[in-house]
Amino acid sequence: HPELSLAEERTTSDIANQLDAMNIPYERPLKTGLVATLRGTAPDAYREDGTPRRRILLRADIDALPVTEQTGEEFASVNEGCMHACGHDCHIAMMLGTLQILRHMTDDIHGEIRIVFQPSEENGQGAKLMIGTGVLDGVDGAYAAHIWSEVDAGTVSCEPGPRMANTDWFRIDVRGTSCHGAMPQRGHDAVMVAAEIVNALQTIVSREISPYEPAVITVGELHGGTARNVIAGTAYLAGTVRTYGDKTHEEMPELMRRIVEHTAAALGAEAELTDYTIANYKVENDAASSERCRQAVLKCLGPAGEGHYRGTLSGEDFSEYLRRVPGVLAFVGTRNPQIGATYAQHSCFYKIDESVLAKGSMVAAQYAIDFLAEPTQEELDGPTIAAVAETNPDLAAKLRSAKATAAEARDAMHDARTARHAAIKGIHDARAAARHEEKRDE
């Protein structure tokens, strides 16, 4: 019974029933999705004021895709036109398995685990909605896993650096002059112009971006024309852009705008980049979190379980969490040709090797335990400053001041990054509005 983004009502209820059976408390801050809490019972799990000494967020997305399943499996979707073709049902299963493990190990949990069953990943809204409810308040790190059809079953890949791409959406409108299909010289063919723009856009990737930097511009829609014997007067294109590089991501709208407008002008028509929307920022694993995850894989699966994957230009809104706290996205491999588990994500034939689910659950549980067992920065710094204070109070005061300044600097850097992204979007919107006004004045 898969359900589309923001309509995951039965899915949410099913998850709630499982949590009830495990006696794990949860809240429903949104119409769909929920947030559970697992409290550690280690002696140092909570401070005297009742706050956890350390808190980690584990996230599983829960929505499906508008795809009609054709796997023929007995458990195939019964909801016409809706399928878990990206494996989010597996993410739910792995997370519930992780909780089954952890609820019997609370004495080993030196803090608190916040589990987010997130709606609406596929349309890029869910993470922002959940974060808006405060799920990242007091969180020190985040973890998520994505089953992946290009990684061998039984292995987990969690390398550092970019793992999933900046994901943007665009629309281009073309205006020509319609005329009789037998008299093309009397008009300007918007469909032909649109086709030229499709080809011209590819020169951005091949000639303006380093060949060592991954980038993709895909036109997924081209619509134009009203009749077979009429030269089309209008057409529009829609598609997606995927990038890793920050500079490329920032410059892409202007690169596309130049190509679009000049290509159309050369053919006697007009074209405009009427929409350019940032859907998701790239998912980037920090080095410390990646190494912690690698160690969890080795502990649970041994050396044979360590997978290696280059990353993908697919997008994921888990990036919204990682823009705010350190963390890791792990790829849990599902590829197994022996059982036909080779189809890519989003295919109507998509299936997985289900034996990997328990392994994914174990790695997530181990990661959470290891993360919470690590000393906090306060614990690392506190004794040192206290010891200094016994012999040199002035120096101790300076150390405390420096620590506070460093914390302020980290906050300022985060605020600056957020402001930069907002400014880029503002520039794009302002330019689009100005061009719209110019066209209207003409």
Predicted regions and their residues:
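Divalent metal-coordination and catalytic microenvironments
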Residues: L58, H88, I115, M130, ...
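Acidic/His- and Gly-rich active-site-bordering loop/insert found
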Residues: H1-H84, D89, A93-L96, Q100-H110, ...
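Histidine/acidic-residue-rich, glycine-tolerant segments that coordinate divalent metal ions
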Residues: V35, L65-V67, T71-M83, D89-C90, ...
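Non-cysteine beta-strand/loop elements that form the S-adenosyl-L-methionine
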Residues: L57-R59, F170, L329-R335
